[in-house]
């Protein structure tokens, strides 16, 4: 009986030591998490974040008021009013609103746009304190486009072979 007791004690001590060693290795190993506000992980070029309206390099807005994005939006979050036809036969929007509360970030609006006017940009930090701040009008969308244009253009160029 003494030999069984001795074997059990040595076995349990060995198991305890190996478990403790494993715990210490993990404790001193490099951390797998990021300290979020100060460190940010990589974002995919196909990430669908905050919406933006883009401009052409000459400063003119890209949206031609075709209303394809409004028609394809499953959440009916987009409202567009087209202005009168211009002398060259094109149209531009008078009103372009997105209700970000309704938006499900599916990306259909971006896929439907024939001129890459509406895009979902790389910004994922757009929390607000009130719901009213999540109703984006044309000016807010154009400001987002101006702010994120370099990253948006890079992401579209990276995704071009797959479109």
Swiss-Prot record:
Record-annotated 4Fe-4S ferredoxin-type domain positions: 53-83, 94-123
Record flagged with keyword Ribosomal protein: no
Major site of localization recorded for this protein: membrane
EC class (word): translocase
Subcellular location: Cell inner membrane
Protein name according to UniProt: NADH-quinone oxidoreductase subunit I
Cofactor: [4Fe-4S] cluster
Gene name per UniProt: nuoI
GO cellular component terms, A-Z: plasma membrane
Cofactor notes: Binds 2 [4Fe-4S] clusters per subunit.
NCBIfam families: NuoI, PRK05888.1-4, PRK05888.1-5
Species of provenance: Brucella suis (strain ATCC 23445 / NCTC 10510)
């Amino acid at each position: 009986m003494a030999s069984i007791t001795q074997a059990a004690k040595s076995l349990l001590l060995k198991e305890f030591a190996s478990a403790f060693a494993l715990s210490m290795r993990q404790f001193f190993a490099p951390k797998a998490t990021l300290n979020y506000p100060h460190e940010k992980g990589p974002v995919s070029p196909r990430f669908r974040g905050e919406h933006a309206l883009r401009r052409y390099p000459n400063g003119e807005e890209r949206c031609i008021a075709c209303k394809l994005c409004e028609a394809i939006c499953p959440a009916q979050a987009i409202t567009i009013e087209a202005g009168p036809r211009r002398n060259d036969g094109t149209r531009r929007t008078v009103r372009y609103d997105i209700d970000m509360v309704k938006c499900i970030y599916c990306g259909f609006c971006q896929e439907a746009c024939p001129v890459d006017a509406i895009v979902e940009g790389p910004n994922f930090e757009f929390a607000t304190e009130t719901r009213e701040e999540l109703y984006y009008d044309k000016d807010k969308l154009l400001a987002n486009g101006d702010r994120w244009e370099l990253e948006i253009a890079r992401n579209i160029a990276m995704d071009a072979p797959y479109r």
